[in-house]
Amino acid sequence: MTTMPRRVFFLLLFVVCVSLAADGAVDLKESCSTTRYPELCVSVLSANPASKMADTRGLALIAIRTAAKMAKEANKAVHDELEANSDEKTRYSFGRGNAKDTQARRDYDCFLDYCMHPIQAAKEALYGRDDDEMYKSARYYFQADYGRWDWNCERCHIPGTPKLPNIISKGSDFDKFMKVTSKLVMQVPGGDIPPPPPNEFANGTS
């Protein structure tokens, strides 16, 4: 019996290993086609080489990490916006003691309720010390809160004031990609995540 040449043997072994590794991989375009913004989904996720070999959960984790970076940027933009518009002549003056200005108070409360707080919640929910914790935190957030998230920073934007930064403007890539991430996360088999113990996911400051 003729012995198989060593080169052929290792070539076949490599092919088998690659096939096994890719066995659980999902088609990126097909997965993204289920989201509301498939082109954005493909464009963002394909930039990460790991997306080519990722299974459903792996793809969701890549999306979560990307959305987390966007959330940090958005959170900074929100704080910069609040700081830049908080003197006595601008819309968020209630935060600096001008309680007599009813409109300023309304604007300030609106900004907190529809812009600052929801974005902070997203930033914290997309955090985890490891992949498992990050996935559970994001999954619980999307299944419990995101469907009711009425985030709209422009709702409180007064005509004549400087335009909001792109990342927190209506229809921004951050807003769209959060919807993409939600869909990808909720498609991972395994069912809903039970409520976490108090403060288990209350982090996201790193």
Regions found by a protein language model. Name each.
Residues 1-26, 204-206:
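Terminal membrane/secretory targeting segments in land-plant proteins
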Residues 22-206:
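Folded extracytoplasmic luminal domains of secretory or organellar precursors
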